Amino acid sequence: MKEEETIEISEKEKDKERNDNQDTLTISWIEDWRNEETATKNENNKNNNSDGDSDDDDYYDDDEEIKNSRYNLFLEKILTLESNSNLKNILSLNINFKKDNKKSKETDTAATTTTTTTTTTTTTTTTTPTATANKKYIRTNNLLNNNNSSSSSSSNNNNNNNNNNNNNNNNNNNNNNNNNNNNNNNNNNNNNNNNNNNNNNNGENITYITSPLSNESLESTEECCFFLVHLPITKDLIFNQFTCLLIHLFQIEYNNTIIINNATSSSSVNSLNRSYNNSNNNNNNNYNSYNNRGNNYNNNNQQQQQQQNPNLKIRDLEGYQDCSHLKKLCLTIHDYLTQLLQRNPLIWYDSIINWSLSTLTIITRLLIILKNNKSQQQQQQQQQQQQQQQQQQQQQQQTKNKTQFPPPPPPPLRQPITPISAMVRERLDFYSFRSLLSLVLHLTRIFSIETFIEKSNVTQFLDITSKSSSSSSSSSSSSSSSSSSSSSSSSSSSSSKTIKPKKLPIYELGWILCHLGKKNPSLILGLTFNHYLKNIGLNSNNNNNKVNSKSQYIQDINCFQILEFLALQPSSYLSIIFQQHIDKIISNHKSNKNKNNTQFLKDIKTFLMLITKDDVFLSIGLPIILDKLSPFGINQFDNNNNNNNNNNNNNNNNNNNNNNNNNNNNNNNNNNNNNNNNNNKNNNNNSIKEDNSSEKDIESIKEILEKVLLGNSQVISFYSKRILLVLYHCCFGDSNDITFSSYSTSTLLQIKNQTRYNVSIKLLTSIVKDRLEKQLINKLYSPILNNNNNNNNNNNNNNNNNNNNNNNNNNNNNNNNNQQQQQQSQEIENSTFINNLNQDENITFYLNQIQCNNNNNNNNNNNNNNNNKLIKEKNNIIIKLISLIGMDSIYSSLIILNHIISKLKSNQFIQYFYTLVEQFQAVNSNTIEFFINDLFKSIDSFSHDDLITLLNNLLELVKITPPPSSSSPSNLSIYNETLKCISSNWVVLLKLIKHPNLIESNKMMSIEILYHSFNNRYNNNNNNSQSIQQLEISNNNNNIKKKEIYPSTLLSDKEMLEIRVLLEKILNLIFKSFKEKNSFERLKKFEIYKNLYLLICNGSSVYFSSTIDLILDSLFSKKTDMIIKLPILCALSPANTLPPPNYPANLVNAGSGSGNFGNGDDDDDEYGDDEYGANRNEKEELYFKQIINPSLPLSQPLIMLPMQSSLLEINYERKYYHYKFNDMNNPNHIPFTNKPKNLKKRIENNQSSAIDTTNNNNKNNEILTYKKQRMKKKKQSIQQNGNINNEQQQEEDDNDDADDQNEQDDYEKYNILNNENDLQSFIKSLVLYDGGGGSGFNNHGDINDRLQILTNQFLLRVSSPYLEPSYENYQEILPKQSHYERDIFIRNLFQQNPFLYRVLEIISIDGRELTKCLEVIKSLLVNEISYWYQCRNSYSESPIKSSHYHTTILLVKALINAEFIIHPLNLSLELFDKIKAEEISYILTSIWNFIKDYQPNPSQYQSSSSSSSSSSPPSNNTIIPTFKRVFSNCNTTPYSLTLKAIFHNHIKELCFHYARFFPKKYY
């Protein structure tokens, strides 16, 4: 009953399957016949199935109904084959055996539970190998799981059921049934099913087919042939049965080769595994824990046995190892079909050729699948072996402490299997191939080759689209393996729904055309061009980027066999054929009305694919195709043919190149045709866009380049430049309108074919990346390896001479030397491609192709964006090519970097700079250093525009820091190295300020570059370099601790000296910036120089000391006249440079300025414009020697210098100078301003070195223009009013001159005041600068140290050696003038250099430091008291007009900041502009008395908490004291009486301020 139920279920499933497949694969007459014979068919099936265990041979028993109708019996046999869904997939040529994961898991689990098989007539069970051979069904099984299904086929149905029940019981009771070995083995099979499913999901299903005709006699085959002729209605089904027979024969032949190759390895593994299983089962009776471990290991053992022996005998094919019977059957079929062709070829030609081509296609694809499965299987075996070893180690560790038994030994490793690729080459040895190929060759004898290709519709069969690939993948998913009837029927029904009818099958015609080409090469050459090879590129076009096994099979094997007969032809014959073929392609393209570019591209691709298979073809065909495709002639771009020929070492290539030149001369007439061709392509760009097939055509070009231009051929390297030019032209240009030399952005906007452009970009990237990079790596690194290997070989040879037992090593070394020589020869050949490109002309050509983005603000923003994308993609290709060329040599890399920095914009330059330098540094680590040094050496060779772009790019490069998140560490290292190299070339950057090619607005760019280079070098968080301040601290710490000083962490003496010189240069530029007439330019330059100086100095005490020394020396020199101070007739030297009594003062002043500050480049510039030039110093020495040591008589005059003051003038100046001191008590005296006009002009002329000539010229020009305008007005007035008295006119002229002089003096004083403020802010910034240490402006330790240095330098120049008066001495003379020598020296020194008051104001930040200057302050205060007392009548109304007013304010400010005075005296500054001069002297006297009574002491000062809490930096106008003075028992009442009296005298003006000065106290 169970058997009948299974039969009924199978019949219902078959009916559903037939109904589902009516629209796809069934034939109309078969469906009608089924409806008529349904009753008889069901009765026969029931009678046959009622016998139970009857074999399939009972189907052929002598039954009365079957004997009476052999016609029905024959149809029944055929229908059993036709009803199977798996065969339908095969016959529909949809063989892609990748299965779905879900379906594979379901079928695999079903295979473990039931192993029944069904057919259309009976369900049988087999017990012997001969029984399995009688199966008339198709079975789908996984190659990796063959052994799982073999156990089910070797037992009866009852035994299978019993075994399945036992398996389920054993799964629950593993520990109780340890003695039963068979049950344990069954458990292992069940336990491994899930593992096998998981491991084999990626495998491919292989369909094993057994034909019903396999066990039949020759009579049944002849009967089929008979019905093929006499019953044409069954023709297709009979052909399908013949196909099944040939496939069966092929499977047996292939299986026999596997068994022969792997017989030894498989037998040894089986024997070892069996012995190991017995040993494990004997040990299972001892301990339960070890028993469980043994069961687990049995599972692993069985799984490993199945994985290591996948190529054992296939159970489905066991009865057919002797295939002689099948060969006889195939021979009869072959003879009978040839007879049919001979009788009536017109009727049978199409049907037989279609059948033969489809059968060949099936067999070739099955062979490819076997090859792919073999490679996948080997990979899975290695992975599983590693997993098993890990599991064994874990189990050993777990059971080590529990059991006393040693762990079982690991199973033996299997020997490697011979690869199937070796058998693929011998596939023609199979009889199935030979029979079908002989049949096809017989067809070509009957008809010609042309008719054969036309009949086979090659162009249609090879037109592979994405639809066909998708249908094949969907149909293949349904061919999963199953053993039960339910699983097989469900899979077949699901597959039938996904299968769609195909109008045009796809045949494998490669081998057929190969054999036809060997027979008739002259005829097949053109046919393969036009019909076959042009479509091979489409086979490799896969939109999903998956490997197409068919295309790989064709290009690896078939193309080589096609060329076997072509290689025998002479070169002259081939060149004629190639040229004629290209001309034919062009003529066909012109004659085509539709101008189909796709066909033209396919033809070109065919030609290129053919010539790449041999160097002889390349040398002949490549020049032809380049001349036809390129719009330029060969002579224009191949000027270096002789040089390139010298690089080639093969004589064959030289001969071929000569032939190429001859052929190219013959082909010059065809260039016009090609130009017209390209015009047609450009005119039809829009039509190509609309055509979907254009994408395939463009992809075919990609395949051309991958197969042709990326091949390892020396001939290609000879034409490397021309190939890249043709590709570049295809990407970006038109042949008629564009030349490479005059290429612009406007032409790029005309590119309309976006798809062609995109693919061309990909093509150029592929050739640049794959071709150039590999050859460059071989060229760069192979010589080093070869030298090392040669040294090692020499050492080995010397050792072998001493040892006679090392002959084998000598032989190995000789072999290695031979291999290395071969590698060297190959690398030399490959390097020619790079050498031809690495030339100055080629490099500059590719660099000129880099374009800038269009930033025009037009309405069409989308067009601009698209054009910018095109430009970016183009530039990326060129940059990639240029980078590979630059990696070949350091010279070419410098050319590339110098070009991009002077031609590109900043955004593009920064992007390309990092990419190029990163690749160049991989070859040469000193690329940046060489580039920066070479750039600054050749800075004068750049034009104006290039120099500006260069500076802009450098500024952006130094300013923009690569972000750490988006940039790689290599970019940061490149950035830091660039900063270091630029900052070290500060000499060139400073000289660029005076560069003649730069305009005034761009001269400060070099200073900005220098500033950002130092700033980012020391302040960059990602930089490991230390700042100058940190290095100085580390120097001091190491010196104190007496440790070793490492040069890697500390600055060397040379670097310290260079920085000192750089600071001196910048300070010189700061003083020169004070001379600018334009206030805005002056402030701009001053701020730039100041920030740069502060950055480089970086708070270092060493550099601060040198800076203060330079500033103070410059203050006392003539270089700061009219900059910081007014010019002096006879200047007084500071205390540290007192001259001898008779030494001229001019020499002192000149020496003081030139000693420290006058060593820069400005001295040379200033003296270079004099009349006597460089001889000035020598004449001055002679002049001063005559004065000091007179050797000539008094009657003889001295040698006078031009523009030099005479002795009379010098004596007069001295007298005038002493007169000032003698008449100092005169209130009307204005020091240093009441000098004669002529003398002042003469002094100004003599002191021209201190005055900028440009500023004076500008001022003089303004004065002259003003005078000219005034003279014009006078002439006009004279003409109107007549003559005027000469006396009146002279008086007016004198008044005008006086007004002009006053205006000029006021302007000079205003500039001097501004310069003093700027210089004070600069010194104050130096004192308060934190140095980037992160502690703000409150780092009081560093500030106090710098203030101490400033105080010491100040006192060194101000403190005189004269005696110091006491307070009692001053009390006797006040408020009169003091005539003590010390006071006179200090008074005159401060009057000549009023900036010293500002220095005191800076020192007053720390009151402790100002206490050191108390003697100077006393002297200054006494002088100011006496002055205001003397001039009490002259400046009684307005004290502001006095020249001492400003100095008095500065002095009192210093006292207030240092807290030398207390409230209300510290508010007295507010009254100075509102009271009389006499009252000012009274207030100063009160201040004097307070300082006398409460003398300041450093111990009275304590640190200021308010200043430490403030985080904002001080401004330039205010100074925050760092220490506060603590007054104890201070009574201010006696000192405030003077202020109260002044308030009473000015009650109306000062009443509003009284409350602040004298606040009311509340008790």
Curated annotation (Swiss-Prot):
Mark out the compositionally biased spans (Acidic residues): 52-63, 1160-1172, 1289-1303
Q: Indicate where this protein resides in the cell.
A: Nucleus; Cytoplasm; Nucleus membrane
Q: Where is the composition biased (Pro residues)?
A: 405-414
Q: Low complexity composition bias: which ranges?
A: 109-133, 141-202, 381-398, 468-496, 639-686, 786-824, 1277-1288
Transmembrane stretches, start-end: 350-370, 877-897
GO CC list = cytoplasm; INTAC complex; integrator complex; nuclear membrane
The record's section on InterPro entries has: INTS5, INTS5_C
UniProt keywords, alphabetically = Cytoplasm, Membrane, Nucleus, Transmembrane, Transmembrane helix
Alphabetical GO biological process terms: RNA polymerase II transcription initiation surveillance; snRNA 3'-end processing
Region listing for Disordered, in residue ranges: 1-63, 102-208, 270-310, 381-417, 466-498, 637-694, 784-828, 1154-1173, 1268-1303
How does the protein associate with the membrane? Multi-pass membrane protein
- Spell out the Basic and acidic residues composition-biased ranges: 1-21, 31-44
The record's listing under Pfam families reads:
INTS5_C
What is the protein's major site of localization? nucleus
Q: What does this protein's UniProt record list under function?
A: Component of the integrator complex, a multiprotein complex that terminates RNA polymerase II (Pol II) transcription in the promoter-proximal region of genes.
By sequence similarity, the record places it as follows: Belongs to the Integrator subunit 5 family.
Fill in the subunit field for this protein. Component of the Integrator complex. The core complex associates with protein phosphatase 2A subunits, to form the Integrator-PP2A (INTAC) complex.
Name by which UniProt lists this protein? Integrator complex subunit 5-like protein
Q: Which organism is it from?
A: Dictyostelium discoideum
